[in-house]
């Protein structure tokens, strides 16, 4: 069915559902799974990145460290210790542009992305509203392959069945 699947990692927990879907599709199709993360250009040119732990990464080590963080994070969710059919790529630039450029260059069959979530204060902290951010919108509109956008279970609509048909 698919030969190459591109999963767009945005480092938010909500994209874990998208990763699980991408991994499942890759396993079923015996496809290569490529995990890509694009570090936005405003960070790339600042010369350094400060993590939330206060660690400072210099510009030359940003991509290597980020690739290591992604490998540790995603490989811990896979049963195999060192899967051969999974590759991690880190790029710098405008995320949707770099995702599309990479997908075209690699002749990707499917792009899998998570949706952006917005907490709904009117309905409580547990209710999330699905939202397509700029990157998901642009990738969906411009990709030359299929795009699969995955929401978390908290984002699913809850329809009540009306059995009274008068």
Question: What does each model-identified segment do?
Answer:
Residues 36, 87-91, 148:
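General small-molecule cofactor/ligand-binding pocket signal
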Residues 18, 45-48, 100-101, 123-124, ...:
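Short, well-ordered secondary-structure micro-motifs
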Residues 23, 75-76, 137-138:
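Active-site phosphate/pyrophosphate- and oxyanion-stabilizing loops and adjacent acidic/basic residues
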Residues 72-87, 143-147:
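A structural motif corresponding to the C-terminal end of an alpha-helix
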Residues 53-69, 125, 129:
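A short acidic, glycine-rich active-site loop
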Residues 78-118, 154-157, 165-166:
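Structural beta-alpha unit
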Residues 104-159:
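Gly/Ser-rich helix-loop-strand patches that form or flank binding pockets
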Residues 1-55, 85, 166:
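Small/aliphatic-rich secondary-structure junction motif
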């Amino acid at each position: 069915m698919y030969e190459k699947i591109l999963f767009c990692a945005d480092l938010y927990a909500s994209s874990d559902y998208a990763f699980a879907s991408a991994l499942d599709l890759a396993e079923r199709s015996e496809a290569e799974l490529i995990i890509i993360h694009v570090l936005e250009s405003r960070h790339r040119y600042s010369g350094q990145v400060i993590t939330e732990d206060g660690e400072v990464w210099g510009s030359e080590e940003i991509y290597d460290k980020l690739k290591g963080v992604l490998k540790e994070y995603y490989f811990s969710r896979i049963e195999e210790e060192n899967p051969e059919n999974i590759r991690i790529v880190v790029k710098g630039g405008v995320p949707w542009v770099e995702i599309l450029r990479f997908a075209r260059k690699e002749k990707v069959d499917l792009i899998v992305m998570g949706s952006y979530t917005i907490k709904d204060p009117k309905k409580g902290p547990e209710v999330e509203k699905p939202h397509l951010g700029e990157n998901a919108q642009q990738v969906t509109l411009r990709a030359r392959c299929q795009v699969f956008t995955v929401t978390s279970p908290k984002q699913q609509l809850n329809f009540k069945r009306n059995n009274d048909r008068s």
